[in-house]
Each structure stands twice: as structure tokens, then as C-alpha cells.
Amino acid sequence: MKLWGGRFRESESELMEEFNASLSFDKKLYEEDIEGSIAHVKMLNKCKIINNEECEEILSGLKSLYKDIRSGKLKIEGDYEDIHSFVEVNLIDRIGAVGKKLHTARSRNDQVAVDMKMYVKKSSYIIIECINKLMETIKDKAENNHFIMPGYTHMQRAQVVTFTHHMMAYYSMFNRDKKRIDNAISNLNESPLGCCALAGTTYDTDREMTSKELGFSKPVDNFLDGVSDRDYIIEVLSAFSICMMHLSRLSEELIIWSTKEFSFIQMDDKFSTGSSIMPQKKNPDAAELIRGKTGRVYGDLIAMLTIMKGIPLAYNKDMQEDKEQFFDSFDTLKMCILVMDGMIATMTVKKEAMKEAVKGGFLNATDVADYLVNKGVAFRDAHKISGELVIYCENNDKAIEELNINEFKNFCNLFDEDVYEFINYNNVIKKGNKKIM
């Protein structure tokens, strides 16, 4: 069932119908399509393009369609080209010929553009809510596990940090992700409804009214731009991809920390799986799947950039491919955030394992150098002395803090008994701007 065909002598081939149809996936837009149609009908009535009785009949029909779809009474299926065809044809079946007036002063080009903008905006707000929940979980886990642990550069133990500070780094990352998505919402918040196919309409319509009715800040400035660009989807997918990158980095650390080699955390059974052959295995599959699905969201972004890169103005059918990319990214990101939230909330942080890792990594070597700087030694010389001290400790299987004062003085006679307090790991994180950790 199509909304066109008058100028054609022959019907599409079955192959072309199957190739061209999008109902199987754009049915997700039924709420937005009906909501946009309701706003459009109200505007047609206000502008005296349809009368009050016609307006009420169409509105009643649209609302009954929405109710029946929501309840499952009406299934979105059948021989329809897209969700727009499904809604309009079913409306006409219900209310008769007056339903044919719904599409006055509107094209599917501005119709699908407004549907997608509304869906992207709604979905983006859902992602922001999910990020907020994850951030609170991270903060709670961080604040309730204020333990020292190794901080790493190049995956080598570097300096002592706290588990709190380490986790709050991800809190900051996700906070920026949230801001990026919110900014993308601001950029897309202009209504394309009323642009029609590409050049507006000869009817004296009220785009300000439909824009306000649908929750947009204003109508788009340019008809061609309104129906032909999907940069707002690309911008949101870019923000989604960056968020997935942060989820993937966190997943990688959780995977490493959960190994016996590290044993910094223990994953809860609720977010772990086992092996079909090795009974002892407890695998961090949830984190691994998040890490893997990051590539999937990246792929959706690259697909959208590629779809749009060579399209002339205005609308082209290529743009039908925007929907599956966005739907997939939204569903994937939402699920990954929810799973990460569950993993963080239920995992156990192992204080003693982190503490032992700190002791074995010479993580106070920089503090030894700082101690000597406070005694008047130039930092570069202090750095050299501290490095030589580390070699001595490695050769003698000792931690720096285990050296006696005479061993310290063999490297520099400025060392005194106060060095032990200065390089104590629990004291180190309380000095200077480290206090924020």
C-alpha cells in the first residue's frame, strides 16, 4: 500500500517493493509519526485549511490508532511501504475520506525528518538518564572504597593513588559525555515540519505553532536544510561513540583487575559467566561484551558519515539508511550503560590486594626525590639518586621503605629519619594537591 502511484503505468516489481520498504524498522517511529500528525492537523485547522469537524475526526482517528498500537490490538505489519503509509492508510480505513486530508501541506520528507528528530531527542534524554545513574553508582562505589592502589602509566606501576580517585576519573569522563549529548540535543532542537518536500508550501501554514507543539525551540531556517541533512544524527552518534569508548576503557580495567594476576576486584556472579569445559572459570563476559560492542557503535557512526558524504540537496532515498544505524546505537549504548552500572554496583573491591601491589612497585620513588628536593637538592639530581636507590632495592629484594637509614645515607647524606614518614604511602596522598584524592 503506497501513498503514490498516479503517474506510473506499471507497479513495482516484488523485488523492488521488498528492497524499498522500511516498515520493518521504521515502525519504531509510530509514536513520533502520530504525534507529529496530531500537531500538523491542529495547525491545518488553526490556519483554516481544514474545518473544525474535519480536525476533530482526524484527531480522534489518530488517537484511536495510537491507543490500539500501544495496547497491541493493532499490529504494525502488512504490505505498507513505511510507517507513514501504515498510519495514513489505517486512518483512512477508520474515518473514511476525511483522513485523506491529513497529508495536506506536508511531504514524507519533512514528516520523516521531524519523526527522526523527535526520536533522537527522546532517546538522547534516556541515555542521559542512564549516564546519571551510572555516575551515581561510580561515585558511591568510589567513596565507599577509599583505599590506596597503584596508579599506572604504560601499564607499569607509577605512583600511589586511591581507588576513589581512579574511579572518579571515569565519573568525569561520563559527565563530559552527558554534556556532549545535551549539546547535540540543543543543536537538533529545530523543527523541519512545514518544509514539505524541499520548497515549503503554497498554503499559509504556521510552522511556529507546530514547532512549539512538538517541543522544539523554533522552526528550521532553511527548507532544503531541514529535509536533507542528518548531521544531528551524526553528532549524537559521535557523542554515543565517545561514551562507548569510555565504557570500553573502564571494561578493560575491570577485566584486568579481576584476573588472579591482579585480583583488585571480584566480579559478582550476576555479571559473570562460566566455561563449558573448565569448571573453575569465572569469566568477565559482561565487560568483554561492552568492549566488543564499542566497535559496533563506531561502525554505526562511520556508516552514517559514509551515507551522507555524497548526497546532493535535497532529500535522497539514501537517508532511509539513517534509522537502523541510530536505533542500533541507541539500543546498544543503553544496554551497555545498564550492564556497567550493574557490574560496578555489585563488584567487590579487594583492599589488601591493592595495598600489596602498592608495596611491591616502588611507587614512592618520586616521593624520595621530592624529599631530597626539600633538602635543597636539584630535582634532576634527586631523580638520579632515587633511581639508583630503586636499583639497589631490586638487587636486594627490598621495598624503599624497608631500607635502614644507613642504606639511605649511602646514596645521599641528606637522608634522615624523617624520610620514613615522608615516603609513607598513607602520608603521600595527603600532601600538596594530592589531598583531592
Curated annotation (Swiss-Prot):
Matches recorded under InterPro entries: Arg_succ_lyase_C (IPR029419), Argininosuccinate_lyase (IPR009049), Fumarase/histidase_N (IPR024083), Fumarate_lyase_CS (IPR020557), Fumarate_lyase_fam (IPR000362), Fumarate_lyase_N (IPR022761), L-Aspartase-like (IPR008948)
Protein name (Swiss-Prot/TrEMBL): Argininosuccinate lyase
Name of the gene: argH
Signal peptide range: none
Listed PROSITE patterns: FUMARATE_LYASES (PS00163)
Keywords noted in UniProt: Amino-acid biosynthesis, Arginine biosynthesis, Cytoplasm, Lyase
Entries under PANTHER family matching the protein: ARGININOSUCCINATE LYASE (PTHR43814:SF1)
Enzyme kind, highest EC tier: lyase
